[in-house]
A protein has these predicted regions:
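Active-site- or binding-pocket-proximal scaffold segments within functional domains
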Residues: 1-332
Length: 332
């Protein structure tokens, strides 16, 4: 039976339901898990900022996800990968690993640690030519067939790399079919570096707020977090992700009030490139706070301009009260 295999990498271990949930936690909680869709979640590690422990823990996270795929993936399944903050770094590492060596047969699961260390998160950088040689070797071991696995959708919220962890390869993620990366205009934690998604199939859009406002977590402005979650969910639905529809499943339905929430944080601002793609919710904020233009490039491209209409479609319509004709009311 063909199915969706959804993998979610969070950025920092926390207790779910305490108000510190990130968008990765929220998305995982919204998944409709069944025989047709299974999910895996990793809560992240507080040690990723330290070089020795950080690389070890990042490899362990990617290794757990890869092992889940080895044990559960079947040919024809769709793989969808999500990551928030530092979890976005691991999400891209797993995606690159799938595009290089694919998924090992279950009988080789004892090689997972080696594969992750050598080809997922190596200590030294490899050239594009070296990555191509690795892919060719993997195909040869697979009886000459292409062993790469496509990632149907890659969803990222302000993906970060702690300076202690190695830079990801610059070669494009050619196995990604579609994706979205929500990035924070107003910067992120000191010392971490924004990790751009190396694929022209991943739409990268800037959102108002700091890192926690886009990725979620402690100190986040929840209305802004909901806007970024809604955008990633919209792409996930289009890619085939099935979300719960029961009464306890609450998907975001942002409106103009949400776009005006919070204040412009004075944190480590990021320099946006010319013609940066901005989420249309920023335009709502600019009308009320034109001084925010100082943080933006001279030329921008507006993205997701129907976001308000999408929110209205997700909100159940209120019941329209019946209008009783005056003559009937008088007769009664």
């Amino acid at each position: 039976m063909l199915k969706n295999v959804v993998l979610c990498f969070d950025q920092l271990r926390h207790q779910p339901g305490t108000g510190d949930d990130t968008n990765a936690t929220a998305l995982f909680g919204l998944l409709d898990q069944s025989d047709h869709q299974i999910g895996w979640y990793h809560a992240g590690s507080p040690r990723w900022a330290r070089q020795r422990d950080g690389l070890t823990d990042a490899r362990a996270s990617v290794g757990e996800a890869y092992t889940f795929l080895v044990r559960n993936f079947e040919p024809g399944d769709r793989v969808l990968v999500f990551g928030a903050g530092r979890g976005g770094y691991c999400a891209q590492a797993l995606t690159r690993l799938l595009g290089t060596v694919g998924i090992l047969p279950p009988r080789w699961d004892d090689l997972v640690d080696y594969v992750v260390c050598a080809y997922g998160l190596p200590r030294t950088r490899r050239t594009p030519r070296e990555w191509a040689l690795v892919a060719a070797l993997a195909a040869e071991l697979n009886d000459g067939d292409d062993s790469t696995i496509a990632v149907t959708y890659l969803g990222l919220w302000d993906a970060l790399r702690p300076v202690a962890l190695p830079k990801p390869p610059s070669a494009p993620l050619s196995n990604v079919r579609a994706g979205r990366h929500a990035m924070a205009v107003d910067g992120g934690p000191f010392g971490d570096r924004l990790v751009s998604a190396c694929s022209d199939r991943v739409e990268q859009v800037w959102f108002r707020g700091g890192h926690c406002d886009v990725a979620g977590g402690a100190g986040a402005c929840e209305p802004l977090t909901g806007i970024a979650l809604d955008w990633i969910l919209d792409g996930a639905r289009a890619a085939g992700v099935v979300l719960r529809t029961d009464d306890t499943a609450v998907s975001p339905a942002p409106d103009q009030t949400d776009a005006l929430a919070g204040s412009a944080r004075s944190v480590a601002l990021r320099r946006l490139p010319s013609d940066a793609r901005l989420h249309a919710s920023i335009d709502v904020y600019l009308r009320a706070h034109p001084e925010y233009w100082r943080r933006l490039p001279d030329r921008v491209v507006w993205s997701d301009q129907d976001w308000l209409a999408r929110g209205e479609r997700l909100v159940p319509a209120a019941a329209t009260p019946a209008v009783v004709p005056a003559e009937l009311a008088a007769a009664s």
